[in-house]
């Protein structure tokens, strides 16, 4: 689960976070 943080909202960084 990717935490709802401003960093994870970035597409590039979000791609490195697990889905959800």
From Swiss-Prot:
* Entry protein name: Antimicrobial peptide AJN-10
Q: Which residues form the signal peptide?
A: none
One BP annotation, GO: defense response to bacterium
Q: Which cell locations does it reside in?
A: Secreted
Sorted alphabetically, the keyword list is: Antibiotic, Antimicrobial, Secreted
One cellular-component annotation, GO:
extracellular region
* Predominant location category: secreted
Q: In terms of domain of life, where is this protein from?
A: Eukaryota
Its annotated function is as follows: Displays antimicrobial activity against the Gram-negative bacterium A.hydrophila.
